[in-house]
Amino acid sequence: MFPTPIERTPRSWQITYQTLLPLALILWLLPLIAVAIFSVKPDADFANANYWGWPSSFEGFTNYGLVFTGSDMPQYLLNSFKITIPTVIGAVALSCMTGFALGIYKFRANIWIFFMFVAGNFVPFQILMVPVRDLTLHLGLYNTITGLVLFHIAFQTGFCTLFMRNFIRALPFELIEAARVEGVAEWRIFWFVVLPLMKPAIAALSVLIFTFIWNDYFWAIVLTQGVESQPVTAGITSFNAQYRAAYHLMSAGSIVAALPPVAMFFMMQKHFIAGLTLGAVK
């Protein structure tokens, strides 16, 4: 049922694995390296088909300076933070409560309610595109940061509930029973007993949701348009002119847009790993 650890496989498989892994890593990193290199090249290098060669001149400071001073990139970055941070807070807060209810209390409709939360994650985005857009238009939330935040919270709560519910079910139930014997109210059990134990899971889930929402492009172009509300993933396309694209500026903007999720992961790396591995071994 489970894959065999590489240490237990024949020596020939281990050599194959050790040979193919660096190649796969290089293939995965190659596009990222290309974008990073092109972000410091002059615009003429693209016209001269100098895609992988050494830059004809180093224009890193100029390109990154133009990204911040010659475009609306600062506003797009601000919009991304305005969208991502409230979404993370809202989705994680709701999932903590729904996960507690579905993980602790036993009632007849428990599994069906849990199934409703999880089933939404299997609906293709393309099916929801037109109904969600029409809904935001009728509610007056189209092309607003608030509308995008509310949609992301609603859509991400299903996955977050799955994550939190499974984490809470792995906690020692004796702690909750002991608190009930002492006459502690249910909301105090959640706030003072369960929630402190959920900190690693909250940290791991926050990093995941932050990355998901920050990198979202599909709903950014479906529900928003213009500088006032579009996040950075959609705003990068503003470097496309009518007849040509400024690929050197687009590459620099892509590097800038990728930095916040990377910084978020490294700042929360300890808690992220603890949240994913807690309960994996006894």
Regions found by a protein language model. Name each.
Residues 2-9, 13-282:
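A structural signal for multi-pass alpha-helical bundles of membrane permease subunits
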